[in-house]
Structure formats: C-alpha cells, structure tokens
C-alpha cells in the first residue's frame, strides 16, 4: 500500500502550522495530524471553500448540543472568497476528540442531528450551486433514488454488482410511493452521519461531534433514515431502531429511499477490492425484510 502524499511545507506555512505531520487513520487514509490540527486534501475546491465558510458559521454558533471542527483560515485570507480556506488543494481544521461508533448511542445521535439540522436550515435557506453538479457515485445514486435521474442513463454502472443487488432494489421499489413536494420540505442535510458522529469516551461532558459533512438537499428526515438504514445493514439493529426513527407512512417511505440509496451506491463507480472485502458484511436481505414487515404490520 502506497504512503499517502503529505501536504508540502508551503501548506503548513499558509496555515501557520509549526508541528510535524503524522498520518491519520480514517479519512480514506489521506489526512494528516499536525499538533491539534487535521489537514485534509480537497476533492472539489468550490465545495470545500463553501464548506469552510459554513463550518466557520456553525462553530461561531457554539451550540451546546453538538460540536463541529473549526476550520483554519489562511494567514493571507481576506474577509471575502474565493481563497480563505484552501491552500494548494489542502484544508485545515481543529481536531475534535471523541470516538465513532453509534452502537447504544442512537438516541444521542438523533438528538445531535436534530439540533445540527435546525441550525443548517437557518444558515442555508437555498441549495448551494454545487449540489446539482456533482457526479460521484453517492450523488448519482441520490438522484436515481429520488427519480431525478434514470439508472439506465447513468454512466459507470457496474452491471455485475448491480445484478447482485437488483433483487433488493426491486423489493424496495415495490414499496415506494410518490411523495408530494408540498408534504416534504427539503433543506441542507448531512446524509452520512452514522460513522461521522464522535461521542465522549473520557467523561469530559463533551457533546457529540459531527464531522466529514456529506451534503444533500433533501427532506431532513432522510438524514436520520440513512442512519437507520446503516444501523440495520451494518450494526445488526432491529425494529427498535426503526421505531426510534418513526413508523408513520411518510417516514417509512423515506426509510425505503434511504435503504435504496445506500444499496445502490455499491453499483456505481464500484471499488471492486473494497466491495469484495465489505459487501459480505452488509445484511441487505435482513434490512429489506425488516422494512417489509413494517409495511405489513405498520411495525
């Protein structure tokens, strides 16, 4: 395995960082520690710059119900865009202590999510421009799930993987019913909370930390529905977690879409070595069956 490419000295100077670099586990193996700062490579500069501004605003709110990582401004940053948070395709933000793993902490995760999304709704009244232009597999699967893009028109579909998951998608598709846009208000959401909420492990009375924002413009319930989907697919959770989320007709429809989205992502721009290592651990069949039972009995 190749060593990750470290940020050059010019990046450390730009953020006024004077500590040695250490590779950080997680973050796709691409990030580095420097003292109490994490340096992260940028995938898309426009989105990363926008996100830096959002995280700065969220940090300034100091909401006691959750924490976010405060981004570092460039030493040469002006008070206006476009170059406040990125240097040579790297960003920097302060490290947040905590441990991931939502097992037995689902209620805490939901409470933090709801406080976080209330603030997002206030800070971001309109969808950012980059939301509709992204082409990575999660964005494409999202548009297919919400019937804004057709699967057959989607590039980079791995048809071998799609064949393996098509039965689950078909079963979920039978439960999908149209959702009126008048019923569901969309807003900015974090759609990958499950492994990206850090919890206090040393009795420091720390609120949950929300990291690695994965942003979409969807109903706020979708953020929690993805957590439920992950809980039953990856963590062996059962009907209790579905009950915690809610089992009214609208929430079940959103949960169906969350499961559909999560499963579909594996068939687009597929990373085959990763899939072969992880797909056997994903209990799609049980997840779809649990949701089917909810529709049969309204849980």
Regions found by a protein language model. Name each.
Residues 27-34, 38-39, 71, 169-220:
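Active-site acidic catalytic loop and adjacent metal/ATP-binding pocket
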Residues 200-251:
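Active-site Asp-x-Gly
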Residues 151, 226-227, 240-299:
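Helix-rich C-terminal or lid/interface subdomains of diverse kinases
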Residues 91-99:
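Short pocket-lining segment of the protein kinase catalytic domain that shapes the ATP-binding cleft
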Residues 100-161:
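A cross-family kinase active-site recognition segment
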Residues 5, 40-88, 100-118:
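A conserved alpha-helical element in kinase catalytic cores
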Residues 3-33:
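ATP-binding glycine-rich phosphate-binding loop
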Residues 3-7, 153-186:
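Short, conserved active-site entrance elements at the starts or edges of catalytic domains
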């Amino acid at each position: 395995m190749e060593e990750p490419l470290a940020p050059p000295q010019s990046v450390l100077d730009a953020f006024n960082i004077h500590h040695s670099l250490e590779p950080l586990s997680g973050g796709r193996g691409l990030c580095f520690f420097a003292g109490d700062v994490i340096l992260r490579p940028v995938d898309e500069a426009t989105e990363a710059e926008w996100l830096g501004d959002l995280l700065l605003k969220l940090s300034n709110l100091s909401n006691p119900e959750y924490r976010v990582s405060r981004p570092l401004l460039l030493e040469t940053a002006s008070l206006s865009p476009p170059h406040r948070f990125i240097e040579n395709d790297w960003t920097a933000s302060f490290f947040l202590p905590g441990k991931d793993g939502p097992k037995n902490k689902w209620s805490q995760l939901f409470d933090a999510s709801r406080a976080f999304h209330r603030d997002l709704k206030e800070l971001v009244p309109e969808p950012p421009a980059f939301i509709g232009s992204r082409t990575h597999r999660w964005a494409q699967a999202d548009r297919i799930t919400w019937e804004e893009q057709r699967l057959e028109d989607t590039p980079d579909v791995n048809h071998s993987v799609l064949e393996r998951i098509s039965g689950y998608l078909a079963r979920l598709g039978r439960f999908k019913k149209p959702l009126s846009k008048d019923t569901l208000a969309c807003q900015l959401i974090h759609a990958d909370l499950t492994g990206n909420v850090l919890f206090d492990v040393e009795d420091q009375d720390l609120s949950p930390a929300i990291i690695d924002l994965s942003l979409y413009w969807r109903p706020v319930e979708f953020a929690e529905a993805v957590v439920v989907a992950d809980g039953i697919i990856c963590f062996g959770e059962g009907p209790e977690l579905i009950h915690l989320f809610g089992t009214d007709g609208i929430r079940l429809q959103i949960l169906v879409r969350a499961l559909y989205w999560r499963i579909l992502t594996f068939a687009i721009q597929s990373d085959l070595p990763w899939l072969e290592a992880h797909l056997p651990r994903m209990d799609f069949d049980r997840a779809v069956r649990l949701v089917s039972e909810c529709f049969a009995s309204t849980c």
